[in-house]
């Protein structure tokens, strides 16, 4: 049964907070962890005062990490959810920076990712595994507590959540492109309360009027999110993505960097392989996919299994919310089925608008991949370990399938709906994806050829 609130004390998934934390995350660790906080402050390639940090010099960060006290016993005693979240963030950054520093420096020297360190030192591994267990998370850099949603502070405390007003509490490169890239994700989530309210309202709607009101709320929220998402092109220059990308790589799916896994000294004897930080761990599209019915059109293949695997890399309260939302929106309780049963033509058109925004979000993300990743490196895996040329297209196909089904239920002319005009725009979407997938099947394809098709078919995101 869908509840009105899902909380772990740091996040509270409800119509007031959406997917953002209950309050601004701690920017600094408590005094008991001064040495760890100092390491975080000295870590970035470029520090806030313009000086070069530890990651700028090969081997310097690893040497500094070994001097940090093992705070295992202190971490065990922490009860405050915000302190736990800040500790998880700190140890996540140290773990990823330590293990991936060699890969970064190899890329700087040779243009390809080198091998990572395969062992996390005991003084980091033990307290990291402890706080991860407290939060119900894997001990590796994640999207929620570590890199994005739990890593912001407001530059102007009285200002809003626009990315220009957000700084990063912890950072790898320390450069403006890293800040713009990840803080824009926080920015987009400022509209998640409306998405939650609308989604919960759809589940509980008792008639067409209530249903349509909440469908409109979801569509409006997604439209705002897409408008903010498109600012990525100016917030973070695509040519600078590699300044920090290697540090958010995961172990699972990236054997070229990590071989068979990562050893956590004093925790596990066998190597572990966790997925890396990725925007695919965000909750906006999973929520929209469930409430719109797109989830029922996911292809049954390995790529969809990757998507399901990523669901584990979320706070437990988010996992519970998505699970309950799905269980409340299946079969005859699904949005498409309910709209069909009542022949709610206005609602079907509102659902098509939601599907349009989901498509634009995914296709915009696909265009980010084409420029930020494919144009920057020949490395075939995303930070989460998924194959970059097929991962998002797999999800776009699901959206297109859902669109086709909903269109078949709409009546031409109802509430001014023009089926012919809609189909023309829809066929352009299909044509674009098919042509792009043809290109990426060719060995040594030119990423620019893939990207140019977006403008050629009038679907350019930039």
Protein language model regions, located:
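Surface-exposed peri-terminal alpha-helical interaction modules
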Residues: 1-462
């Amino acid at each position: 049964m869908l509840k009105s609130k899902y909380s772990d004390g740091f996040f509270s998934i409800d119509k007031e907070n959406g997917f953002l934390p209950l309050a601004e995350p701690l920017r600094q660790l408590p005094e008991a962890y001064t040495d760890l906080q100092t390491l975080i402050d000295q870590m970035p390639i470029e520090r806030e005062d313009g000086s070069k940090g530890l990651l700028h010099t090969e081997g310097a960060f690893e040497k500094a990490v070994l001097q940090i006290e093992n705070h295992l016993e202190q971490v065990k005693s922490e009860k405050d959810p915000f302190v736990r979240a800040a500790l998880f963030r700190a140890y996540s950054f140290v773990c990823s920076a330590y293990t991936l520093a060699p890969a970064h420096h190899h890329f700087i020297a040779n243009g390809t990712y080198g091998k990572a360190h395969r062992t996390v030192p005991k003084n980091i591994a033990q307290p990291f595994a402890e706080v991860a267990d407290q939060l119900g998370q894997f001990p590796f850099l994640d999207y929620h507590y570590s890199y994005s949603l739990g890593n912001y502070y407001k530059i102007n405390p009285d200002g809003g959540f626009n990315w220009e007003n957000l700084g990063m509490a912890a950072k790898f490169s320390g450069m403006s492109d890293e800040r713009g890239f990840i803080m824009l994700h926080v920015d987009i989530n400022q509209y998640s309360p409306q998405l939650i309210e609308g989604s919960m309202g759809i589940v509980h709607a008792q008639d067409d009027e209530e249903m349509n009101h909440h469908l409109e709320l979801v569509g409006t929220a997604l439209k705002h999110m897409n408008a903010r998402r498109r600012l990525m092109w100016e917030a973070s220059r695509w040519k600078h993505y590699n300044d920090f990308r290697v540090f958010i790589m995961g172990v699972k799916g990236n054997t070229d960097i990590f071989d068979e896994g990562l050893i956590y000294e004093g925790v596990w004897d066998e190597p572990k392989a966790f997925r890396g930080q990725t925007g695919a761990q965000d909750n906006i599209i999973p929520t929209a996919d469930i409430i719109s019915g797109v989830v029922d059109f996911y292809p049954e293949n390995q790529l969809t299994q990757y998507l399901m695997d990523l669901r584990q890399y979320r706070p437990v309260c988010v996992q519970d919310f998505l699970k309950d939302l799905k269980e409340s929106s299946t079969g005859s309780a699904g949005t498409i089925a309910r709209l069909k049963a009542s022949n709610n033509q206005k609602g079907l058109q509102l659902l098509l608008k939601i599907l349009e925004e989901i498509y634009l979000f995914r296709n915009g993300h696909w265009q980010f991949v084409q420029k930020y990743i494919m144009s920057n490196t020949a490395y075939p895996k995303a930070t989460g370990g998924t194959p970059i040329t097929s991962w998002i297209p797999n999800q776009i196909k699901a959206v297109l399938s859902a669109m086709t089904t909903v269109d078949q239920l709409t009546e031409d002319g109802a509430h001014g709906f023009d089926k012919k005009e809609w189909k023309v725009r829809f066929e352009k979407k299909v044509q674009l994806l098919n042509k792009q997938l043809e290109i990426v099947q060719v060995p040594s394809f030119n990423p620019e050829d893939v990207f140019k098709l977006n403008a050629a078919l009038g679907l350019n995101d930039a």
